[in-house]
């Protein structure tokens, strides 16, 4: 059992035991004793004089092993030759000191103790097993109440609680032996031991069939789950109460001598000491037959000390040490960021690494980095030693060490040899995505700073203001190979988030390229003609022609057939020099660079070169344009002075106009024509417009081309060049320097009405300066907080998606999703071609109106195909998606499509889940780190009208309009759309037209681009009369339902609807306005219903009681929320909210069926709305809506499945339940993308789909049928299918269930792997659950494998594991055959006495043999 770990003195490493799964379960007392090497009887640790461990104490050498290698405690046996001898004097076995890390001890408890995890971790497992409440349990355990265990023939019941007095009385009444009642953990243990699990389970199932109501079945199901898990796992319930406590090995709770004779010790020793002390005292008290009350108190204290050892602070007071600091218990060792899981198992420190400051290395190639000689010498020491020895320069390691320390010249030569083609990895913290670690070839440099290639800065998000980076050396050949092939910076040109190049010039380089490609009128040498590129260069060098002159030149190009041809171009010398760097390729013509290059264009050029000319060419090209960009920027000498910021002359007139406008608004407000909110909104709008005008004027004057004396065009303004090229700065920043600073936001996001009119060049007034501090300070504090939030979001995403790996080529699924262009407010934000690029088609795409197949099903769409499809005017395509993939584990390659970072089909073994999590999480951090550059300047201004974005013919969809007195057309419909069609009838734009919108166009009218289509009031939502008549107020009682609000400033009064439910008699009221005709009869609408307008809270009435109302008049207005500034601050929590699948506070109510709206009888403070199905009038679905909420549908309206009955954000769960998976996916993708798009961040849809797939893994059981699944349980789709297949094979009823959406935190905690869940959050709860259920971890995901110390089953790790498994199987066959031979031989030989055979030959199961080396 406890054999020595090392079998061979010369091979101290025992053969590795391979395993396929890890099971965790409760330990029985026998199991604990089998681990133990002896009982610990004394609380002493070591003798303070001799520093030797005390015998039978917490560090006892006899139990745990020797302190020095191969030496017993008293020193009688020393050295290897006595290996395995047990010293008869001190009882210590002579062996390695290392065994003190693995040998355990135990403590025999004088009285049983409940394990706090199973007692207090909710739901309490002991409580569920015994069907007792936690309070009752604690009363029994902490000796306050007795519990009846065996009622006998008395009137008592099993599990009844009794106080001490009641117990005495009962004994008097029934006699001493008539019943059994007990107190403390013994009682609980007896009750648990008495449970017959199978009978209990049958009983519970029977109860469940009869149970009615809401809570009862839930409770029974909870108990049944626990009982079942005990049955399946083979655990016994009484093991939740401990009689023996294991003691962990002493080296894991060390006692370290400090200088000065003091000791530092682990808290665990303190906690163990407490337990031993109390246990020994209890033993003694029992021997002395002490009074009950004393013994009980001691037992209670023992229970408390064991609780503290397992989980300090979970119950009662926290036990503190000498310095008032809480002691770290066993649970605390595992929990949290500093616990075992996250600190030591998931993140380890590594050797062969160093760190230093980084500086730029513009003369490096893309695959190189500069490594300081000193660092290289230290990092590559072992390699240098071995080379020195191989070359015969040193005979021993010691000599080699001396040589290296003296830094002899031959050492440097050898260092050069060693680092040749030995890549090193550079890493910059925070590593937000996989491009944060890349491999480079080191180049030795003088100095102490690492040199980094400028082009990889954007991938590392590095700058040279003092950033540090770490260097790591891959040692083994395999590691070097992987670093070279997979991690080399030249292999990471494209970003995994969106497939765009990430190795892109920035700042100086962009400025240089922009300057090079400028074209100016009237420069020297304009109109010259050149025969070749060389001639141009010659003329430039001779100074005959300017870099920016307009010239004509002949340039070599490649035509379609791959032949070289000469073509003439009108261009400039600068562009020709740039064109000379382009690789010769038909797909990369000179036209690519024959234009003014801004950052976007440069990125596009690199993308084109990478796609069509291959990786090698594009890397060389990048290096060349980097060098050129730097050189030209330096030659151009572009700089920035205060006179480069031009303040437009028209600034003050524009500001004056706006001031007049604002005065008007103030006046209107004083006259009571508009409310304060409207005035605020109008003022804010006026100033935003003014700001835009000033900015336009400034940009106009800065970007205007100027001529000098001799008529040649001057260089553009240098600040304009910087911003326009995309090198640095933005229009917003220029506006603040030379226009006006604009409106500022308060910390809560409201906009301050008074803008900052000055700019930084003029200088701010004191008041303006004070106003601008708000935003600036908020920006800084946000940055700090959001970084943490974003990091946490990434961590949750990684955790939920970590086991999503490409496991197969094709899962063969039939289902797919529809891709359409994403349209936002009538403008296409991402085209169909962007959405289908790199995806696999599920169905053929045909040219509209014909049968011509543009792309067949099953093809991977590349750039050419997507362009073809886009040009053909295809509206939508069906594509494969990770959401619909049917692979058992992970996803299949066909459903995923292209690996964005490589531009080819994704490989099996790619960890797409982690890539998705990083792609979504990384920009979150980026954006939050970048909020403050604009300094809190408000970006806002509401749009109140819409102009045609295309010309064409107007078509209405679901039209419902009404003409009012003034002859204006008002929209009365809820889901009306305005569509603009081109001449072929193709839809060019579509806009949702909201209720109350004023239309300027009619059906069939032709509009030109820029025509005004319709306008609306962005600040209030009107309620419009549909018929004429007299208004009559119902229940609008002054003081209860409406209040007259008098504005102090204007003296005008308005009637505002207030929350009437809070008033004493308010609940009966139904405030509304109805229309009556001259006879006082209600006016009826077309459907024959009376025209009523229920009022919602905060509505402002626009008419008086008994007023005449014409059709189309506004009856009341409901204010909309004011304009808030939008930035990722609102965005990051929004993304988290979406992925956590939280229900929004006032969530929209979605219609579940098609049908007609009917208002039902009202409740106290809820309104009842029913939808009567259009197919089956008896089928109704009811909804409750809080009174006072505005309901956008009226009695008798027809609604379609999926329409909103109440406005707000929909809850994603509802979308899933009503509209299905695809609608949910569309919603999630659009919402998440909207947040990122606002920041200009591109993320591919498939990443979001992968995360949503992980959120949809579980099914909720509706009916259990004849399966073992229970109603309300969440199970994996696989388990669900398996259980149903099992039931059907026995001709039983299958279970019914439906997919549910879990938030990412919930989903990570419910993964199959308990190791992964435990390392994520709520460690104790996860482990408690796992051990009760006897869970097995199959080690499928990445985290589990990292934790148990294996290669991850992705990438090369996945392949290695396959090979290993095959080898293992082969070995097993051979070993079996050998064993059978040996057994046969043994049987032939004479029978030998048993004790002659050594006990350790057959001890290890045979299949644990080391893998074969062939």
Curated annotation (Swiss-Prot):
Function per UniProt: DNA-dependent RNA polymerase catalyzes the transcription of DNA into RNA using the four ribonucleoside triphosphates as substrates.
Example GO molecular function: DNA-directed RNA polymerase activity
Gene3D superfamilies per the UniProt record, alphabetical: 1.10.132.30, 1.10.150.390, 1.10.1790.20, 1.10.40.90, 2.40.40.20, 2.40.50.100, RNA polymerase II, clamp domain, RNA polymerase Rpb1, domain 3
One Pfam family it belongs to: RNA_pol_Rpb1_1
Catalytic activity field: RNA(n) + a ribonucleoside 5'-triphosphate = RNA(n+1) + diphosphate
Example GO biological process: DNA-templated transcription
Quaternary context: The RNAP catalytic core consists of 2 alpha, 1 beta, 1 beta' and 1 omega subunit. When a sigma factor is associated with the core the holoenzyme is formed, which can initiate transcription.
EC numbers: 2.7.7.6
Binding site for Zn(2+) 1: 72, 74, 87, 90
UniProtKB keywords: DNA-directed RNA polymerase, Magnesium, Metal-binding, Nucleotidyltransferase, Transcription, Transferase, Zinc
Keyword Magnesium found: yes
Gene: rpoC
UniProt-listed CDD domains: RNAP_beta'_C, RNAP_beta'_N
Gene Ontology CC terms, in alphabetical order: DNA-directed RNA polymerase complex
Binding locations of Zn(2+) 2: 811, 885, 892, 895
NCBIfam families with a match to the protein in the record: rpoC_TIGR
Binding locations of Mg(2+): 463, 465, 467
Family listed: Belongs to the RNA polymerase beta' chain family.
Protein name stated in the entry: DNA-directed RNA polymerase subunit beta'
Cofactor(s) the record lists: Mg(2+); Zn(2+)
Naturally occurring in which organism (per UniProt): Roseobacter denitrificans (strain ATCC 33942 / OCh 114)
Record note on cofactor: Binds 1 Mg(2+) ion per subunit.
């Amino acid at each position: 059992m406890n054999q020595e770990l090392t079998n061979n003195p010369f091979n101290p490493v025992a053969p590795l035991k391979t395993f396929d799964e890890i099971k965790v379960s409760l330990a029985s007392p026998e199991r604990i004793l089998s681990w133990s090497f002896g009982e610990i009887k004394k609380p002493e640790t070591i003798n303070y004089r001799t520093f030797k461990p005390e015998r039978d104490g917490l560090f006892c050498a006899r139990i745990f092993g020797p302190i020095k290698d191969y030496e017993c405690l008293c020193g009688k046996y020393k050295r290897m030759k006595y290996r395995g001898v047990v010293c008869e004097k001190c009882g210590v076995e002579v062996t390695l000191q290392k065994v003190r890390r693995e040998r355990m001890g135990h403590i025999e408890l004088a009285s049983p103790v409940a394990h706090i995890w199973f007692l207090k971790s909710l739901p309490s497992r002991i409580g569920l097993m015994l069907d007792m409440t936690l309070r009752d349990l604690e009363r029994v355990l902490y000796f306050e109440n007795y519990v009846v265990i065996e009622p006998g023939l008395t009137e008592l019941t099993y599990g009844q609680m009794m106080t001490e007095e009641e117990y005495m009385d009962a004994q008097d009444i029934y006699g001493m032996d008539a019943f059994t009642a007990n107190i403390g953990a013994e009682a609980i243990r007896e009750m648990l031991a008495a449970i017959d699990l199978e009978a209990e389970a049958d009983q519970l199932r029977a109860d469940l069939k009869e149970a009615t109501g809401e809570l009862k079945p839930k409770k029974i199901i909870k108990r049944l789950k626990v009982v079942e898990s005990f049955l399946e796992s083979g655990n016994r319930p009484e093991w939740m109460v401990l009689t023996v406590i294991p003691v962990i090995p002493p080296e894991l709770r060390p006692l370290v001598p400090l200088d000065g004779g003091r000791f530092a010790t682990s808290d665990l020793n303190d906690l163990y000491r407490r337990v031993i002390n109390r246990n020994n005292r209890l033993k003694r008290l029992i021997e002395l037959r002490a009074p009950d009350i004393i013994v009980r108190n001691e037992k209670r204290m023992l229970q408390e000390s064991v609780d503290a050892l397992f989980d300090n602070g979970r119950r009662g007071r926290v036990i503190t040490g000498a310095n008032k600091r809480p002691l770290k218990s066993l649970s605390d060792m595992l929990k949290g960021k500093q616990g075992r899981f996250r600190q030591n198992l998931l993140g380890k420190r590594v050797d062969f690494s160093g760190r230093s400051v980084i500086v730029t290395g513009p003369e490096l190639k893309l695959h190189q980095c500069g490594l300081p000689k000193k660092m290289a010498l230290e990092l590559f020491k072992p390699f240098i030693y071995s080379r020195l020895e191989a070359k015969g320069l040193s005979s021993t390691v010691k000599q080699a060490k001396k040589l290296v320390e003296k830094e002899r010249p031959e050492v440097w030569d050898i260092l050069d040899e060693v680092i040749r083609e030995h890549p090193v990895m550079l890493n910059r913290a925070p590593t937000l995505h996989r491009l944060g670690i890349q491999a480079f070839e080191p180049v030795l440099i003088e100095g102490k700073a690492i040199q980094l290639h400028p082009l990889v800065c954007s991938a590392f998000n590095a700058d040279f203001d003092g950033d540090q980076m770490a260097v790591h050396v891959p040692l083994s050949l395999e590691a070097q190979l992987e670093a070279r092939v997979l991690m080399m910076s030249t292999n990471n040109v494209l970003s995994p988030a969106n497939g765009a190049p990430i190795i892109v010039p920035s700042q100086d380089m962009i400025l240089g390229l922009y300057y090079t490609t400028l074209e100016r009128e009237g420069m020297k040498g304009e109109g010259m003609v050149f025969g070749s590129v060389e001639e141009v260069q010659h003329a430039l060098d001779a100074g005959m022609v300017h870099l920016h002159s307009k010239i004509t030149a002949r340039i070599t190009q490649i035509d379609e057939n791959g032949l070289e041809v000469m073509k003439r171009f009108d261009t400039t010398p600068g562009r020709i020099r740039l064109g000379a760097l382009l690789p010769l390729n038909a797909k990369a013509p000179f036209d690519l660079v024959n234009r003014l290059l801004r950052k976007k264009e440069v990125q596009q050029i690199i993308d084109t070169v990478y796609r069509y000319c291959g990786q090698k060419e594009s890397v060389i090209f990048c290096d060349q344009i980097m060098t050129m960009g730097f050189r030209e920027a330096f030659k151009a000498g572009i700089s920035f002075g205060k006179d480069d910021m031009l303040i437009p002359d028209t600034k003050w007139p524009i500001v004056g106009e706006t001031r007049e406008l604002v005065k008007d608004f103030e006046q209107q407000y004083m006259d009571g024509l508009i409310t304060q909110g409207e005035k605020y909104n109008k003022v804010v709008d006026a100033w935003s417009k003014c700001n835009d005008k000033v900015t336009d004027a400034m940009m106009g004057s800065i970007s205007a081309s100027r001529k000098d004396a001799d008529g040649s065009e001057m260089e553009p303004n240098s600040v304009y060049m910087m911003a326009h090229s995309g090198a640095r700065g933005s229009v917003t920043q220029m506006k603040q320097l030379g226009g006006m600073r604009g409106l500022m936001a308060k910390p809560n996001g409201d906009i301050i009405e008074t803008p900052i009119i000055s700019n930084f060049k003029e200088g701010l007034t004191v008041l303006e300066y004070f106003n601008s501090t708000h935003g600036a300070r908020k920006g800084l504090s946000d940055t700090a907080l959001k970084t943490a939030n974003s990091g946490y979001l990434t961590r949750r995403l990684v955790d939920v998606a970590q086991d999503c790996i490409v496991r197969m080529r094709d899962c063969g699924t039939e289902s797919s999703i529809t891709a359409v262009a994403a349209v936002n407010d009538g403008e296409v934000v991402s085209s169909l071609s962007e959405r289908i690029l790199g995806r696999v088609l599920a169905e053929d795409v045909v040219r509209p109106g014909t049968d011509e197949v543009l792309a067949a099903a099953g093809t991977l769409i590349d750039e050419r195909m997507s362009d073809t499809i886009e040009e053909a005017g295809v509206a939508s395509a069906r594509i494969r998606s990770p959401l619909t993939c049917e692979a058992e584990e992970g996803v299949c390659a066909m459903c995923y499509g292209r690996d964005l970072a490589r531009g080819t089909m994704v490989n099996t073994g790619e960890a797409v889940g982690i890539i998705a999590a990083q792609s979504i999480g990384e920009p979150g951090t980026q954006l939050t780190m970048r909020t403050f550059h604009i300094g809190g300047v408000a970006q806002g201004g509401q749009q109140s009208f819409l102009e045609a974005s295309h010309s064409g013919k107007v078509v209405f969809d679901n039209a419902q309009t009404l003409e009012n007195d003034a002859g204006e057309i008002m929209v009365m419909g809820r889901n009306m759309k305005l569509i603009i069609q081109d001449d072929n009838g193709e839809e060019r734009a579509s806009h949702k037209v909201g209720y109350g919108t004023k239309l300027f166009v009619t059906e069939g009218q032709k509009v030109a681009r820029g025509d005004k289509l319709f306008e609306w009031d962005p600040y209030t939502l009107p309620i419009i009369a549909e018929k004429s008549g007299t208004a009559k107020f119902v229940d609008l009682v002054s003081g209860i339902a409406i209040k007259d609000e008098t504005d102090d400033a204007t003296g005008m009064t308005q009637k505002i609807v207030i929350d009437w439910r809070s008033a004493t008699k308010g609940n009966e009221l139904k405030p509304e306005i109805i229309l009556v005709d001259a006879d006082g009869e209600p006016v009826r609408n077309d459907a024959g219903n009376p025209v009523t307008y229920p009022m919602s809270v905060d509505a402002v009435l626009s008419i008086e009681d008994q007023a005449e109302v014409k059709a189309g008049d506004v009856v009341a207005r409901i204010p909309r929320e004011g304009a808030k500034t939008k930035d990722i601050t609102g965005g990051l929590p929004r993304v988290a909210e979406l992925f956590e699948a939280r229900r929004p506070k006032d969530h929209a109510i979605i219609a579940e069926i098609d049908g007609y709206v009917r208002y039902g009888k009202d409740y106290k403070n809820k309104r009842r709305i029913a939808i009567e199905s259009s197919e089956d009038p008896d089928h109704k679905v009811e909804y409750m809506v809080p009174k006072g909420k505005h309901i956008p549908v009226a009695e008798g309206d027809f609604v379609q499945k999926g329409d909103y009955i109440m406005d707000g954000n929909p809850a994603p769960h509802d979308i899933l339940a009503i509209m299905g998976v695809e609608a949910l996916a569309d919603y999630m993708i659009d919402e998440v993308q909207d947040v990122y798009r606002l920041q200009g961040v591109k993320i591919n849809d498939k990443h979001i789909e992968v995360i949503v797939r992980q959120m949809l893994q579980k099914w909720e059981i509706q009916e259990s049928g004849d399966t073992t699944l229970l109603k309300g349980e969440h199970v994996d789709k696989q388990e669900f299918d398996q259980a149903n297949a099992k039931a059907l094979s026995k001709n039983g009823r299958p279970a019914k269930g439906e997919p549910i959406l879990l938030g990412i935190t919930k989903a990570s905690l419910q993964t199959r792997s308990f190791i992964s869940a435990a390392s994520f959050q709520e460690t104790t709860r996860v482990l408690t659950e796992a051990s009760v259920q006897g869970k097995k971890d199959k080690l499928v995901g990445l985290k589990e494998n990292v934790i148990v110390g294996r290669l991850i089953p992705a990438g090369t790790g996945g392949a290695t594991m396959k090979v290993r498994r095959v080898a293992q199987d082969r070995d097993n066959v051979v070993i079996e055959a050998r064993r059978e031979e040996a057994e046969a031989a043994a049987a032939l030989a004479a029978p030998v006495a048993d004790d002659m055979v050594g006990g350790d030959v057959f001890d290890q199961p045979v299949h644990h043999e080391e893998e074969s080396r062939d």
